[in-house]
Amino acid sequence: MKKLTILFCLSLFAACHSDQKEFRRALAAAGENRQQLEQVIEYYKHDEADSLKLRAAVYLIRYMPLHKSYDTAIEKLYDRIDSLIPNCKKNADSLAGAISLLYDRFKPSLNTLFDIRTVTADYLIRNIEQAFDLWQTKPWAAHLEFGDFCEYLLPHKCIDLQPLTDWRTELADLYDGELGMHTNEAWCRKLISTGQVVGLPS
């Protein structure tokens, strides 16, 4: 039994050390943007009540080197796609073809940027605050353990290459009433935990 306890403690120490190493690598990968990430840590590290938010910030930063976003040029493509929809509502194939042609035309002007090098402290802090607000106030999210919260509710964007916009506010304006009014709490929990709700990664 003593050997098992020692082995467990060693593996726990190794996991924590690995997490810290990934976090330090992420800060190094940020280059000149490192100061923005450090501002997020600084914002949460002084108040004991924010200890979970600090852990959430570290989680986001640790995995951020894996993610990229389109720059603002993608907005022009989105606007063009939006203008196609009324004309192609009845024919999904023609809409898909038109979108494909538009994408091919816009692709040379679309640049991708590493999130770790471009995200601002304000953006991450707002994202963390909004995610915690959902977790603490919405019945469909209250059942999530911290690990599930980090995986499904905390991410700073829905999909890779998504521009760094205020998407949470936009989705809340569109869908909050629908989720908030749903009476089948078990259904909502299942939907959230499997990542099937708009705005959550699957």
Model-derived features: positions:
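N-terminal accessory/pre-domain segments preceding catalytic cores
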Residues: 16-201
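Bacterial Sec-dependent N-terminal signal peptides
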Residues: 1-23
